[in-house]
Design a protein with these regions (language model features):
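Interhelical loop/hinge segments that connect adjacent transmembrane helices in multipass membrane
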Residues: 1-3, 7, 177, 193-233, ...
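N-terminal membrane topogenesis motif
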Residues: 1-26, 77-84, 88, 149, ...
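Signature of the first transmembrane helix
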Residues: 6-64, 94, 98-105, 128, ...
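Helix-loop junctions and terminal segments of transmembrane helices
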Residues: 29, 58-74, 144, 255, ...
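Alpha-helical transmembrane segments of polytopic membrane transporters and translocases
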Residues: 40-58, 183, 236-238, 248-267, ...
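Alpha-helical transmembrane segments of multi-pass membrane transport and lipid-handling proteins
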Residues: 85-113, 168, 266-269, 290-341, ...
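Hydrophobic alpha-helical transmembrane segments
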Residues: 119, 123, 152-200, 256-259, ...
Length: 474
């Protein structure tokens, strides 16, 4: 019982460490949209997409090996040597990547027909990614040592300082997109030094090629699946830059910023449910337990999806510059994909519990191929609508495949019906019914939201008050 309470406590602290920095970055959104143009946002989205992709290439999923084999080390010395050996390899490997990109990157991006200058924007992104690698293994270490509070405080402090520095550079020094990128680079350097310092007593620097080969044999098969997932979710940004323009990319990125707020709902809820799923796996009543978890999870997701979609227009009208007001149109389309990705994450946990990790990778690779092909085919003709719907379609297909593969004996009609209800309400009150008076529009949508979530609670047999009470207790 005590162990269970400790697990819940640690999980909640980890979730806060991820959620609070995301909320802080969102706080800056209303300010930044008044000082940055859609083109500036397009540049930032492109660089962020590139950095996300580079992080997978930079680590080759070796951090997964570290998490799995840390406690299999024979003693504390072996644990310290594992961290030192892996850190030495990762730093040396990434220095080579940085040098190659500095030498050949400009030529490569010309082949992509990118509209973003390699110098200074892409260079800053590459350097930021390099210094960010210094935080990955230490973060994994502190999770293994079950010291969530310390790690969470570091993440929150980084989020606060990043927010302040970004606003100073953009608002007071008028650095526009460069201000955001400079703040990320500066903080990545500062926290690289901090992480090196705090891990000194847990590390013995060394290089053991034999062990590195064992690590790579374990981790490299995981890379295609990880890359495929990010290709599915971020390749649209790269292709929008190629086939459309930076202004469109900025509008799309702004819509995605609001839609991805749903991840805050899903991540917090999932982190609360995940340990219980693994703990209950194999029990006779697992299907019943999972169905109850799924219904609660779907309810939270649909509540967030509907709220973000309904009020997206009013949000941009109140909190963003006029140039970004049209972004609301794409929010509901993108949110479908975010919703499907979150549900997929839940069923992916079941597949992982079955020990079928290759299935997740195979589905992600399939989705990545479909996503790239459809975007290349449809973007030039249908623009941002194609980008939003292709991403959502692919993630929906991946989700359905995982649901089928999980092969759980549970009811599937209720979440489907709930999803269709939310889609219908969203279509009517975002695209069909528009009130010019913003106050009346907000009042109407609050009423619609309240009625709809009441209907969803009946369909899914969920008590929203119990969900809130459960999170408060945790």
């Amino acid at each position: 019982m005590a162990e269970s309470k400790k697990l819940i406590k640690n999980t909640t602290i980890y979730a806060l460490g991820d959620i609070i920095p995301r909320l802080l970055s969102f706080v800056a959104f209303p300010v930044l949209t008044h000082y940055l143009t859609p083109t500036d946002y397009g540049i930032l989205n492109y660089v962020n997409a590139l950095s996300t992709f580079l992080m997978v290439v930079s680590f080759l999923c070796t951090n997964t090996y570290y998490l799995v084999y840390f406690y299999r080390c024979e003693d504390e010395i072996a644990q310290k040597k594992l961290l030192g050996n892996l850190s030495t390899f990762i730093i040396a490997y990434n220095l080579i990547i940085v040098l190659l990109l500095l030498l050949c990157g400009n030529y490569f991006f010309k082949l992509l027909d990118s509209k973003i200058s390699f110098y200074p924007y892409i260079i800053i992104g590459i350097l930021t990614n390099f210094f960010n690698i210094f935080s990955i293994l230490p973060s994994a270490l502190y999770r293994l040592l079950e010291k969530p509070l310390f790690l969470t405080m570091i993440n929150i402090s980084r989020g606060v300082i990043t927010l302040v520095l970004t606003l100073i550079l953009v608002v007071f020094f008028n650095y526009s997109a460069l201000g955001v990128l400079y703040s990320l680079l500066i903080l990545s350097i500062v926290y690289a030094i901090i992480f090196l310092f705090i891990t000194q007593k847990f590390i013995i620097w060394n290089f053991n090629w034999k062990q590195i080969k064992e690590i790579l044999i374990f981790s490299l098969p995981l890379v295609p699946g990880s890359l495929a997932y990010y290709i599915t979710t971020i390749s649209d940004r790269i292709l929008i830059d190629k086939y459309l323009n930076l202004n469109d990319l900025g509008i799309y990125g702004t819509a995605s910023t609001l839609a991805l707020i749903l991840n805050i709902f899903s991540y917090g809820a999932y982190k609360a449910f995940e340990p219980f799923i693994f703990k209950s796996w194999g029990e006779e009543n697992f299907s019943y337990i999972f169905e109850k978890i799924r219904n609660n999870f779907v309810y939270v997701l649909l509540f967030g999806s509907l709220g973000l979609s309904l009020f997206s227009k009013e949000f941009f009208q109140i909190f963003s510059g006029v140039k970004f007001h049209g972004a609301y149109f794409y929010v509901p389309m993108i949110i479908i994909g975010v919703y499907c990705s979150s549900v997929k994450m839940l069923y992916g946990t079941v597949v992982t519990a079955k020990g079928k990790t290759k299935v997740n990778s195979g589905i992600s690779i399939f989705g990545a191929i479909i996503s790239v092909v459809l975007n290349i085919s449809l973007l030039p003709s249908f623009g941002l609508v194609a980008a939003a719907l292709v991403s959502s379609l692919v993630l929906a297909i991946e989700c359905l495949i995982l649901i089928w593969y999980a092969k759980l004996d549970i009811h599937r009609n209720t979440p489907i019906l709930s999803f269709l209800v939310v889609c219908l309400v969203t279509f009517l009150f975002v695209y069909m019914i528009n009130l010019e008076n913003i106050f009346l529009s907000i009042v109407l949508k609050i009423t619609v939201l309240t009625v709809t979530i009441s209907i969803l609670s009946k369909i899914l047999s969920v008590n929203p008050f119990e969900i809130v009470k459960g999170f408060i207790k945790k």
